């Protein structure tokens, strides 16, 4: 109890969620405590470090404490390429250090090592699909409206895990004084048409 948490990104496109009638293609960063299966999630749009960091931190701050270890699959936002001498990326190492965590990654072609969260991904989508059917619509008035709906679902899913969750919470370590700053700061030049280029994208 209180030792290991796992996380993963899961694609929610197949559920057909819409915002004011427009398709809302998104991912959920899914965070799970492996002993109790307590879970939570954060809406995001890419498997970037910012999404990983934001989702992880939302998870532990909602928990109110920090487990000993965090395991992911071989996300490029966290894990270096095989030919790199460092196991994890610099920014992910900084995140682990900030929370005093031991990082773990799955071995190549062994997603079963992240099995708890992989199984919860499947069950989350099934539960969300059923909740949307009971609601009678997959359309929401805003992203926040959908986020509240998703949050209520996590509360329902966690309701039957209270006893084992209590065992975990009692063993979690204290949170740091503040969150880790996961923003990426860029120095850019303004182009001739009042545009800027950042991360290979042009913005006006």
Describe the function of each predicted region.
Residues 1-39, 50-54, 185-198, 203:
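Mobile-element integrase/transposase regions
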Residues 24, 41-69:
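Active-site beta-loop-alpha junctions of metal-dependent nucleic acid enzymes
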Residues 65-84:
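Acidic/histidine-rich, metal-coordinating catalytic segments
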Residues 121-204:
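Active-site-proximal acidic segments at structured loop/helix or strand boundaries
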Residues 1-16, 90, 166-179:
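Basic, flexible linker segments flanking DNA-binding modules
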Residues 93, 98-114, 134-137:
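RNase H-like polynucleotidyl transferase catalytic core
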Residues 83, 103-126, 142:
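RNase H-like two-metal-ion nuclease catalytic core shared by retroviral integrases
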């Amino acid at each position: 109890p209180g030792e290991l948490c796992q996380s993963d990104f899961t694609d929610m496109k197949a559920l057909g969620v819409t915002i004011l009638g427009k398709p809302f293609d998104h991912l959920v960063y899914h965070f799970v405590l492996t002993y109790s299966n307590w879970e939570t999630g954060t809406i995001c749009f890419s498997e970037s470090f910012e999404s990983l960091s934001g989702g992880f931190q939302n998870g532990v701050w909602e928990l109110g404490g920090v487990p000993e270890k965090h395991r992911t699959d071989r996300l490029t936002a966290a894990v270096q390429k095989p030919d790199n001498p460092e196991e994890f990326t610099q920014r992910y190492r900084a995140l682990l250090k900030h929370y005093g965590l031991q990082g773990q990654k799955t071995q190549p072609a062994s997603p079963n090592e992240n099995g708890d969260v992989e199984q919860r991904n499947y069950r989350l989508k099934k539960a969300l699909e059923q909740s949307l059917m009971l609601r009678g619509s997959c359309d929401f008035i805003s992203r926040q409206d959908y986020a509240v709906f998703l949050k209520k679902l996590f509360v329902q899913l966690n309701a039957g895990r209270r006893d084992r969750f209590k065992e975990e919470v009692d063993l979690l370590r204290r949170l740091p004084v503040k969150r880790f700053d996961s923003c990426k700061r860029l120095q850019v030049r303004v182009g001739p048409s009042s545009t800027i280029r950042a991360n290979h994208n042009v913005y006006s």
